[in-house]
Design a protein with these regions (language model features):
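Conserved Radical SAM active-site core
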Residues: 1-133, 137-143, 153, 157-158, ...
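Conserved strand-turn element in the central/C-terminal portion of the radical SAM core barrel
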Residues: 148-149, 161-174
Length: 174
């Protein structure tokens, strides 16, 4: 497994996605290594010889300028990685950008397979109108283990329950 830190010019990327104005990808690569992942096409834009799921570039970016540009906009975390994959516990890049965006008036749309997002529940609650989505491809835990390296389905459902009970819109990709 190859994990390294890389410097980037900015973390907020304008997007034409119908669900958001900005895409936020704090990492390149994803160690969930889902066999069905649409984002694996990103490998061709890297210099990594490793297969998708076996490398992770951890982004470092400068402070956000012009915070006013985000008012009444929406940011999607993340279009080609999981913002709460296991190494987020160590590097905390998703938490860093959430802290930088606090008070800007931006809405969040977050997609994950992880319950690590519970760490940031109070922070996410501070962004009105935000929503969080979890991917659940099966209820068969043995099959899930063959398909991805994410946390168990039970842990995903429990995280979803806690966000729902906290008043945050929750959705599920099945």
């Amino acid at each position: 497994m190859n994990i390294k830190e890389v410097d980037v010019k900015e973390i907020m990327t304008r997007t034409n996605l119908p669900v958001s104005d900005f895409a936020v990808n704090p990492y390149v690569g994803c160690l969930h290594a889902c066999k069905y992942c649409y984002a694996s096409f990103m490998k061709r834009f890297t210099n990594h010889p490793e297969p998708w799921g076996e490398f992770l570039d951890v982004k470092n970016w400068p402070a956000i300028k012009d915070r006013g540009q985000f008012r009444d906009k929406e940011a999607f975390f993340s279009s080609v990685t999981d913002p709460y994959q296991p190494h987020e516990a160590k590097f905390q890049r998703t938490r860093k950008i959430l802290e930088q965006l606090q008070g800007t008036g931006i809405r969040l749309s977050i997609s994950t397979k992880s319950d690590l997002i519970l760490r940031d529940l109070d922070l996410i609650k501070s962004f009105p109108g935000s929503r969080v989505s979890w991917s659940i491809n099966t209820l068969d835990e043995d099959f899930r283990k063959e398909m991805d390296h994410g946390v168990s389905i039970e842990r995903r459902l429990e995280a979803m329950r806690q966000f729902y009970e906290a008043g945050i819109e929750t959705t599920c990709f099945i």
